């Protein structure tokens, strides 16, 4: 497991945010934005997003096997120092492990994410079939009447939710369209 995550981190350091990540970040200039992501790649932060909740952890970090969410035992790795030797111990004496939510583990950040959704005025959901739980269940925390935009190239069954507008396109194209919908005056100016 350790060597597998060492290999993934090597790929991570060469990854760059796409236009969708940058457009999400650009919304922070006009709105209070919280990003809730299932991805572990930190590309939202690389694009400049400042408030990100990582549901499934972060590939660039390692933690204690005994107490994985204790900040005292979470370490951030760098491209220069990202390989972890198998058997390396955390500060509490347990094995150091990737700061990743493994299959069948609980998702501790789901409660803070649900709290954010309960207070949002607009919910944007990108790149999901709404079949992966518990993240798919976050929509149920949205207050009645709050507009929800779902951006995904594939049709998604949203019958269980009200006020969902689907933008059936990829993340970058969908974020461009959403930006136009949120700022119709500025998108008209750029077209003129």
Description of each model-found segment:
Residues 1-192:
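Conserved catalytic alpha/beta core of Sir2/sirtuin-type deacylases, generalized to analogous enzyme cores
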């Amino acid at each position: 497991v350790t060597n597998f995550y060492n290999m993934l981190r090597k790929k991570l350091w060469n990854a760059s945010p796409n236009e969708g990540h940058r457009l999400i970040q650009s919304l922070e200039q006009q709105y209070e934005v919280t990003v809730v992501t299932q991805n572990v790649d930190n590309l939202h932060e690389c694009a400049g997003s400042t408030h990100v909740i990582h549901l499934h952890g972060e590939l660039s970090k390692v933690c204690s096997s005994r107490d994985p969410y204790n900040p005292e035992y979470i370490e951030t790795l760098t491209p220069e120092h990202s390989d972890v030797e198998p058997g390396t111990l955390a500060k509490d004496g347990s094995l150091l492990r990737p700061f990743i939510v493994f299959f069948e583990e609980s998702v501790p950040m789901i409660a803070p994410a649900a709290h954010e959704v309960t207070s949002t005025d607009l919910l944007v959901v990108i790149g999901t079939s709404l079949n992966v739980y518990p993240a798919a269940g976050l929509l149920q925390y949205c207050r009645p009447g709050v507009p929800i935009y779902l951006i995904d190239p594939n049709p998604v069954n949203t019958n269980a939710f009200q006020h969902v507008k689907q933008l059936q396109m990829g993340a970058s194209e969908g974020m461009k369209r959403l930006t136009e919908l949120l700022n119709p005056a500025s998108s008209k100016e750029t077209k003129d």
